[in-house]
Amino acid sequence: MAGRVESSIGGGEIDEEGDERGSMWDLDQSLDQPMDEEAGRLRNMYREKKFSAFLLLQLSFQSLGVVYGDLGTSPLYVFYNTFPRGIKDPEDIIGALSLIIYSLTLIPLLKYVFVVCKANDNGQGGTFALYSLLCRHAKVSTIPNQHRTDEELTTYSRTTFHERSFAAKTKRWLENGTSRKNALLILVLVGTCMVIGDGILTPAISVLSAAGGLRVNLPHINNGIVVVVAVVILVSLFSVQHYGTDRVGWLFAPIVFLWFLFIASIGMFNIWKHDPSVLKAFSPVYIFRYFKRGGQDRWTSLGGIMLSITGIEALFADLSHFPVSAVQFAFTVIVFPCLLLAYSGQAAYLRKYPHHVEDAFYQSIPKRVYWPMFIIATAAAIVASQATISATFSLIKQALAHGCFPRVKVVHTSRKFLGQIYVPDINWILMILCIAVTAGFKNQNQIGNAYGTAVVIVMLVTTLLMMLIMILVWRCHWVLVLLFTLLSLVVECTYFSAVLFKVNQGGWVPLVIAAAFLVIMYVWHYGTLKRYEFEMHSKVSMAWILGLGPSLGLVRVPGIGLVYTELASGVPHIFSHFITNLPATHSVVIFVCVKNLPVYTVPQEERFLVKRIGPKNFHMFRCVARYGYRDLHKKDDDFEKRLFESLFLFLRLESMMEGCSDSEDYSVCGSQQRQSRDGVNGNGNEIRNVSTFDTFDSIESVIAPTTTKRTSHTVTGSSQMSGGGDEVEFINGCRDAGVVHIMGNTVVRARREARFYKRIAIDYVYAFLRKICRENSAIFNVPQESLLNVGQIFYV
C-alpha cells in the first residue's frame, strides 16, 4: 500500500494535506452509500405499515392506556377550575360546555391528532423529535459535528429544495444566523422544560382530584386526610418506577377503556335524567353569549377550560409506542365521543345542582356505582400519571443525546420495548417536587392554574416548530402555513392571556420549575459547545503526527489504547498532551468518537465507522460510534467487543479492496469510477485514503452482482487477505496484552477576559453540574482497572 493515508470520517476529513484523496477514497465512497436504485430505497426505513382491521383495533385499544390517560382524566377537575367561585348564572354552564366542545375539536382533534402527529420523526414524537427533523433539513444544530456520511444512514431522511423556493430561503435565513439557531434551541428547551413541569403537575392534580372523591361519600373526612392519601399514592407510584411498566402495562389499556366507558355511560344517564337541553352547547352561538355577558371571571375561566385539553403534550411525546393511524382511530372513535358525553353529563347535572361544582364529577355519579367508580378513577389517575412520567423520562433521554442535559443514569426496563426507560435521578426529583406541590397547595384549583400555564406554553412552542416543519420538511405553500399558524396562535394566545391572570394563584409554579431546568439545560449545552470548540481549535496537526514516524517518536508498549474524544476528525489534544507527558504509547491506538445524530436510532450494523490513520505500520485507527436519540448505552451492548469486530471487518475489507484496486475491473468493483482529487485516476498506484463502511452488507453489495470475471478478482483479493489476517492477529495479540481506555478528565474554566455572566455560567454552574453528573467511563461501562484519565484544563 503505497503512499500516506490521511485520517477521515467517511473520507471527508481534511487536514493540512487532506485535499489529496486517491482512488481508494473514491472506492470507499461508492461502498459507503446505496449501490443502485434498489438500495436507494432503503433510505428512510420508516414507513407506516398497512394494518388489518383487527390489528388496527387491537393497537388502538392498547394506545388508550399509554397515550390518552392524561387527557381522559380531565373531567375530574375541569368544571371546578372553571368556576372556582361558584356558578352565578346557570347559562354560564352552557357557554363553558360549548367552549370545552370546540376546544376539544380544534386542538386535540384537528391540530394534534390529524396534523401534529403526522410530523413525527420516523414514528417518534415530542419537541426534540421535531428539532431533530429540522436539524436534518437545515444546519441549525449549534454543535457542528455532523458529516455527510451521516446522511447515508438508512434512518436519515431529508428532502431537497429548489434554490429559489420559499423553503430554501427560510433554510438559508435560519442557517446564516447564530442567534437564530440559539433562539430555536431555546424554544425547544422551553417546550421540553414545560413538559417536565407536566410530569410534576399531572400526578399531583390527577391523584389529588381522584382522592378528593372520598369527601363525597365520607363527609366527615377533612381535606388534610385527602392530601395524605394522595401523597401516599404518589410516593408509591414513584417508588415502583424502577420496575418499569413491562409487567403491569397490559393492565393500562383495560383500565382506561373502562374509565372511558363509565364516564360516557354516566354522562348519557345525567343528560337523560337532569337536562337534555345542554346539547344545545354544540352551537358556537353560546360561546358568543357567554363572553357577551362580560366580566373578568368569564375570561379567566378559560384557564379552567384549558384543562380539558391537557394531556395532548404527552399524547405527542408518547407517539412512538403506536402507529399514527391507531392513535387517530382511538381518539376519533373512543376518546372524543366519550369525553363529549362526560362533559355534557356533568353540565346537565350542574344545571340542576350548581352548588355541587366543587366535586362535580363525583356528585354526578349515581350512588350505587360510587365505589367502583372511585376505584376506577384512582386507577385511571395513576395510569395518566405514569404516562406523563414515562414521557418525561423519554424527553430527558432525548435531551441527553442532543447535549442539552447533564449525564444521568438511564436504565432500560424492558427487553421487548426500546422506549421503556427509567431515569433514577429525575424520578426522585419529580417525586419530591410533586409531593411539595400537592402538600403545599392542598387544592386542585391552584394546581390546575399551574397546569394550564404549562400546557398552553407547550402548545405555543409546538405551533412555532410546526410552522418550520411545514416549510422545511413538508414544503407546504406559504398560504397554508400562514393559515395553520394564525389559527393556532389565535386560539392558544387567547388561552395564554387567560392563564396570565392566574400566575399569582399558582401559575408561577411551572414558570419557576421551567426556569430552573432551562438554566441547567442551556448552561450544560453552552459548556459542551465551548468544550467542543476548544478541542477543534487545539487538535493536533496530522502532518506532525505522520512526521513522527511509525513509532511516533515514542516507546510502543504492547496493548491497545482507546483514546476517547468528541472530535470526529483530526488528532485530539488529549493525545498530544498524553504523549508529551508520558513518552510512550500502545502498539495500537484507536481514537474513539461517540457521536449522537439527529435521528431516532442508528441500526446496529451501521453503528461503527472505522478508518485508518497513517500507513499500516502506524497501527492507528479512528472509530466513530453513532447513536440516535432513542439508542441506549446498555451494559449488555458489549461496546468494546463490537468495536473490535468492526475493526477486524474493516481490515479484511481493506485487504480485499487492495486486491481489486490494480485490476482492470476496478471501476465495476467500486460501482462507479470518479476522477480523484489529487489527479490520480482509478487505475493509479498511489493510495491516499482508505475508508470503508463496516458492514457485511457493504461487502455483499460489491460481490453479489459480479460477473464471472469479477469472481476471479475476488479470489485474487482473497489470496491477498494474508496481509489483513496478519494485522488482525497482531491486534488480537495486543488485545490479549490489555486494552486501556484513555479519557480526558478536563477542567473547564472561563478566560480571565470573559464577561461576568460567562464566568458565572462556566466556573460555577457548569463546573457544579460536571461534578455531580455521571462520568463517561460509567456510561460506557469501562472497568476502573482499565481506565486512564488524562487531566487537562480548557480555558474557553
From Swiss-Prot:
Region entry Disordered, spans: 1-30
Q: Which residues cross the membrane?
A: 59-79, 96-116, 185-205, 218-238, 249-269, 299-319, 322-342, 369-389, 421-441, 454-474, 481-501, 506-526
Question: Which residue stretches are annotated as topological domain Cytoplasmic?
Answer: 1-58, 117-184, 239-248, 320-321, 390-420, 475-480, 527-796
The places in or outside the cell where this protein is found are: Cell membrane
Per the record, ranges on the Extracellular side are: 80-95, 206-217, 270-298, 343-368, 442-453, 502-505
Q: Which InterPro entries match?
A: K+_transporter, K_trans_C, K_trans_N
Q: Cellular component per GO?
A: plasma membrane
Q: Assign the protein's first listed, main location to one coarse class.
A: membrane
Membrane topology for this entry? Multi-pass membrane protein
Any Pfam family: K_trans_C
Keywords (A to Z) from UniProt: Cell membrane, Ion transport, Membrane, Potassium, Potassium transport, Transmembrane, Transmembrane helix, Transport
Q: What GO MF terms are annotated?
A: potassium ion transmembrane transporter activity
Q: Write down the PANTHER family for this protein, in alphabetical order.
A: OSMOTIC STRESS POTASSIUM TRANSPORTER, POTASSIUM TRANSPORTER 10
Q: Which family does it belong to?
A: Belongs to the HAK/KUP transporter (TC 2.A.72.3) family.
Its biological purpose is as follows:
Putative potassium transporter.
> In its UniProt entry, what is this protein called?
Potassium transporter 10
Originating organism: Arabidopsis thaliana
- Provide the organism lineage as a comma list: Eukaryota, Viridiplantae, Streptophyta, Embryophyta, Tracheophyta
Q: Which gene encodes it?
A: POT10
